[in-house]
Amino acid sequence: VITEEWRSRRDASQRMYEQLLPKVYPDGNPYSKRLPIGLIETIQNFPYQALRDYYEKWYRPDQQGIVVVGDFDVDEMEKKIISIFSTIAKPVNPAERFYVQVPDNKEPIIAMAKDKEQQYVQSYIFMKHEDIPDEMKSSLNYYITLYAKQVVGRMAAQRLAELAELPEPPFIDAAIMDDDYFISKTKGAFTGIMISNEAGFNTAITTLYREMLRILRHGFTASEYERAKAEFLTMIESAYNQRAKTTSASYCSEYVRHFIDNEPIPGIETEYALSQQLAPAITVDIINQYVMSLGQTDSNLVVACMLPDVEGVQYPTEQELVAMLKAVEAENIEPYVDKVSNEPLMSELPEKGSIKKSKESVLGYTEYTLSNGAKVYHKETDFNADQILFRAYSKGGLSLYDEAEALNLKVASEVMGVGGLGNFSTTDLSKVLAGKKVSISSTVNTFSEGMSGSTTPKDIETLMQLIYMSFTAMRTDDDAFKSWQNKQIALLKNAATDPMTAFNDTLVAKLYSNNPLATQLKLEDVEKIDYARVMEIARERYANAADFSFIFTGKIS
């Protein structure tokens, strides 16, 4: 069983992780010797007694916890647990549990691994620092640190998203956060992650490093922080409002994290109260003091790269990569300028329609017919105190178009939204919607077109505006489409190196009789997509709301 698990996991990422471990954990550090599943040589050849010895050594009462969550009699369950487990004796002179430490490094560590099945470049930049000890996690300072990590990650994501939207994006995707160092819990790291194609490796990794240094040198702006703070408070408020519906699995995972890592479990009521008190009191200057302490360039720098092994592609050597990063460090990196629009989502509201008729259903919902002909189905529920779900659909879809347009048709759902809505790009839209819990997406399927989304009672008006704009204000942005194209090219360039690509292509071809609408997008097709025609098709499908049915359920009267 273990061998099969090891075999099924052994993809390009696993093989490269095994190559990287001795480099990112040098000098024989125990982390360098194996991944948690172990070495296949040991798995296939260990004596049975070794397994029993390991069990006796580590599976003992002082090392174990019992978490039980569900609908039961607490007193009775406690008695059963005590009666079953209290008789297990603690061993005499038990083995001491130890935590493997990760030493600092003065010179940069560069670790590069290649694999022929790797489809894209995936690189990590770590700036190691001391982590917060488990025994200090019960303090208020630790909660403040968790809050700071959250908002820093959100603000960094916004900056990187802007770069990813450029016509010639420096990477396919990227993130910056403060987290554990690689696979170890005993060391923290200010971490940057990026995905690119092999040709764009140099640009991608230097851009990521530059943005990390921009944060460390200049911090964040007040407007960035206000958005991130609003998003955090909205997230906490939503969890608080839904506290009566918290699942047993959520409680269980929270208790397990407490047992294993001493993560605090104050409960959502306490956490909500803390966030309402602390977030308004923590200024952007405090956040910047925190973030500027996370990394330094004179030591503890580690770069780990997982690279496609492609014939003819030359990556920089370890020395060349260090020189590239040193050149970025020498740059005069300017502070980030946050471009924020004060324009409202909709500058003018449309003229109100009216309800022509309504009808109650025996199934508990109400059907409304609007003056424009659209149907609205509404059912108020109490399953979730802070959620409204929405769907809309209309018959038609891609089936109304000629098969010769298959290429434009099958990317319509993905491409139609890359430009944003109204006067807002996707990045600008995310800034305008900061602090609001609202989502919406539009699709054009084979036999229908539609929308789906969700919101909260307090943000229902924003959802309604987004629905209206999705019909009337689809935004064409040639730069955003070019960015999407370039990212698709980067992702698809080495897709054929993944054995699952050939398997999936063959399966789809057989299941759908080579229907061109069902086949996956190919590298050679990306440049052939007609963006203007895709947007024309999208606008045709959403030209008239009269034949749409809108469904709203949840906490909505």
Where are the regions a protein language model picked out?
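M16 family metallopeptidases and their MPP-like homologs
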Residues: 1, 13-41, 63-69, 119-140, ...
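Flexible, low-complexity linker/tail segments at the boundary of structured domains
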Residues: 59, 542-543
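An aromatic/glycine/proline-enriched structural segment found at the starts
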Residues: 65-121, 230, 234-239, 323-343, ...
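Extracytoplasmic/secreted cell-surface and envelope-processing proteins
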Residues: 74-78, 134, 312-315, 425
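Long, His/Glu/Asp-enriched segments that create or flank divalent metal/ion-associated functional microenvironments
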Residues: 145, 149-153
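Edge strands and adjacent loops of beta-rich recognition modules
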Residues: 342-363
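N- or domain-start disorder-to-order transition segments that initiate the globular core
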Residues: 357-385
